[in-house]
UniProtKB/Swiss-Prot annotation:
Catalysed reactions, semicolon-separated: protoporphyrin IX + Mg(2+) + ATP + H2O = Mg-protoporphyrin IX + ADP + phosphate + 3 H(+)
InterPro entries per the UniProt record, alphabetical: AAA+_ATPase, CHLI-like, ChlI/MoxR_AAA_lid, Mg_chelatase_ATPase-isu, Mg_chelatse_chII-like_cat_dom, P-loop_NTPase
Protein name, per record: Magnesium-chelatase subunit ChlI
Pfam families associated with the record: AAA_lid_2 (PF17863), Mg_chelatase (PF01078)
Biological role: Involved in chlorophyll biosynthesis; introduces a magnesium ion into protoporphyrin IX to yield Mg-protoporphyrin IX.
UniProt record, GO biological process: chlorophyll biosynthetic process; photosynthesis
Gene transcribed to yield this protein: chlI
Organism of derivation: Anabaena variabilis
Length: 338
C-alpha cells in the first residue's frame, strides 16, 4: 500500500540495508503510464496526471498508454536543488514563448520509490524540498516569473546509520514505518550469508537464476495482495485499541493511527486473508510508532520495547520480557490469537 508512506531503515554498518532496498526494484510490478510522459502520469487518475495530460484528457483526445516497471530513483547526498526539482530553460522560454522544463528526480520518482541512502546526512535545503513534496504530492518550480508544477507522489525510502547523526523529526514523521537492523550474532547464519555472497561474486548470473523462481513467486504474491487489499476489514474495536495505544504513548498527530491501520491491513492482504487479527497489529505497530515517540534523554528502555509494553496492556496480551528485548526492542508478545 503506497499510502503507508514509505519506510526508514536504520542500523549498523555493513548489515545489507542498501542492498536489500535496491533489490526491491526487481519485485516491483509494471504499472500503466502515459506514453512518452516524463512524469509517469496515470492515464485514469487526474491527481496523478501532469497538467498537459489532464488538459488532453479533458478534450477527449486519445491518450497513448504503455506499461513500465515502477521506478526506483536514487537521491544522491550531493544533488543540487535544480537536479532534484527540475529546471526551466529561461532562454528558450523567452525566445520561443514556450515553457521549456527539464524534469528532475522528483518527476522521475512520481508513482515510484525515492531512495535516500544515508538520509541523516542529507542537506537541510533538500530535506525542506522533500517535506514540501511529500506533504502536497506536487512539485512546483518557479524561476523568473515562470511557474511549472507536476505530480510528485512517491514512496520515500531511507536508510542510515544512527551513529552518524540524528534525523530531523519533521522528516522522520514522513516515513510511515521505521525498522532497526542489528548485526547478526548467530555464527551459522553469518556463515550462510558469507557463503551466499561468495557464490554471487563467483558467478552472478547463475546465482540470480537459482533464486529466480522464489523471486517470481514473491512478486506474484505482492501483486495478488494489492488486488485483495480493498477487501480487507479491520474491526472497529481493534481500531479503537490502536488509537488508545497512540494516545497512551503521546504520539503527535494522527499519522501514527492511520499508518498502523494501513500497515495491518497490508500485512493481512499479503498473507491472503481478509480479516485483521491482533497478531497482525502486533507485528506492525512497533514499526509504525517507535520513531514517533518523543525523545526522553532520561529514558533507559528502547522506544520499540515501550510500544510493545503499552500494546500488550491495552490489547490484553502477555508480553514475555527478557534482558535482550529491553535492550533492542525485540520483545516477544504471546497473543494466543490468530
Amino acid at each position: 500500500d503506497p499510502k503507508i508512506g514509505g519506510v526508514m531503515i536504520m542500523g549498523d554498518r555493513g548489515t545489507g540495508k542498501s542492498t536489500t532496498i535496491r533489490a526491491l526494484a526487481d519485485l516491483l510490478p509494471e504499472i500503466p503510464v502515459v506514453a512518452n510522459d516524463p512524469f509517469n502520469s496515470d492515464p485514469s487518475d487526474p491527481d496523478l496526471m501532469s497538467d498537459e495530460v489532464r488538459q488532453k484528457s479533458g478534450t477527449g483526445a486519445e491518450i497513448p498508454i504503455e506499461f513500465k516497471k515502477v521506478q526506483m530513483v536514487d537521491l544522491p547526498l550531493g544533488a543540487t536543488e535544480d537536479r532534484v526539482c527540475g529546471t526551466i530553460d529561461i532562454e528558450k522560454a523567452l525566445s520561443e514563448g514556450v515553457k521549456a522544463f527539464e524534469p528532475g528526480l522528483l518527476a522521475k520518482a512520481n508513482r515510484g520509490i525515492l531512495y535516500v541512502d544515508e538520509v541523516n546526512l542529507l542537506d537541510d535545503h533538500l530535506v525542506d524540498v522533500l517535506l514540501d513534496s511529500a506533504a502536497s504530492g506536487w512539485n512546483t518550480v518557479e524561476r523568473e516569473g515562470i511557474s511549472i508544477r507536476h505530480p510528485a507522489r512517491f514512496v520515500l525510502v531511507g536508510s542510515g546509520n544512527p551513529e552518524e547523526g540524528e534525523l530531523r523529526p519533521q522528516l522522520l514523521d514522513r516515513f510511515g514505518m521505521h525498522a532497526e537492523i542489528h548485526t547478526v550474532k548467530e555464527p551459522a547464519l553469518r556463515v550462510q550469508i558469507v557463503e551466499q555472497r561468495s557464490e554471487f561474486d563467483q558467478n552472478p548470473p547463475t546465482f540470480l537464476e537459482k533464486y529466480n523462481p522464489e523471486q517470481t513467486a514473491l512478486q506474484k504474491k505482492i501483486v495478488e495482495a494489492q488486488k485483495l487489499l480493498p477487501e480487507v476489514k479491520l474491526d472497529y474495536d481493534l481500531r479503537v485499541k490502536i488509537s488508545e495505544v497512540c494516545s497512551e504513548l503521546d504520539v503527535d498527530g494522527l499519522r501514527g493511527d492511520i499508518v498502523t491501520n494501513r500497515a495491518a491491513k497490508a500485512l493481512t492482504a499479503y498473507e491472503g486473508r481478509t480479516e485483521v487479527t491482533v497478531d497482525d497489529i502486533r507485528r506492525v505497530i512497533t514499526l509504525c510508532l517507535r520513531h514517533r515517540l518523543r525523545k526522553d534523554p532520561l529514558e533507559s528502555i528502547d522506544s520499540g520495547y515501550k510500544v510493545e509494553k503499552v500494546f500488550a496492556r491495552i490489547f490484553g496480551v502477555e508480553l514475555l520480557e527478557d534482558d535482550s528485548s529491553q535492550k533492542n526492542g525485540a520483545g516477544q508478545i504471546k497473543t494466543g490469537v490468530r
